[in-house]
Design a protein with these regions (language model features):
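RNA pseudouridine synthases
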Residues: 1-193
Length: 193
């Protein structure tokens, strides 16, 4: 959502200039890493921003990610439960991170994974995959040194789908898999079944 250290524009600036947000202010409801592609919920007013924030807090919004990872996991499906660390000033803070995973395909030393985070920690999926020996392909921050990457060094993590319910109505939004992601799938002989 925010601009990176080398970029002056962010998604909010871009949205403000669109017809959909004319006369309103976009309220980001959650974060997505700047290199990650896919679905992002942005509310058009404070009321809905607060509603979606509360749905996230009580874990009523479910996100699905697709990821191309380096390596293979020990199981075809399961749950990662890890303690992640970050710093607030000089204090080291420990937080619990939970992610459900399913291996969709593997070939050589690459895996196509479906990831469903139960918690929403900063860089959670990237950190957990590194902990479990399968870093995200193209991740320059959370990587195993001297491991292969892709030619364009793009992060192969895609926020594929978001599901939630409001007042007994179910909603599901998905983002098409980017061309760059499809190319790497083809290059690594991985298939989404």
């Amino acid at each position: 959502v925010q601009a990176g250290t080398k970029s002056k524009r962010n998604i909010l600036d871009i949205l403000k200039s669109t017809i959909e947000f004319k006369g309103t202010y976009p309220y980001p409801v959650h974060r997505i890493d700047k290199e990650t592609t896919g679905v992002l919920i942005v509310a058009k007013n404070r009321k809905y921003a607060q509603l979606f924030t509360s749905l996230f807090r009580i874990r009523k919004i479910h996100k699905t990610y697709l990821c191309i990872a380096l390596g293979k996991l020990n199981k075809d499906k399961g749950t990662f439960i890890d303690e992640l660390f970050h710093y607030e000033g000089d204090r080291k803070i420990k937080t619990k991170a939970i992610t459900h995973f399913k291996v969709l395909d593997t070939n050589n030393n690459y895996s196509l994974l479906k990831l469903n985070p139960q918690t929403g920690r900063k860089h959670q999926l990237r950190k957990q995959l590194l902990i479990h020996g399968c870093p995200v392909l193209g991740d320059n921050k959370y990587k195993i040194i001297n491991r292969k990457t892709n030619k364009k060094n793009l992060l192969m993590l895609h926020a594929y789908k978001i599901n939630f319910s409001i007042a007994d109505s179910k909603y599901s939004f998905s983002a098409e898999i980017p061309f760059s992601f499809k190319n790497i799938l083809k290059e690594k002989y991985l298939k989404i079944s």
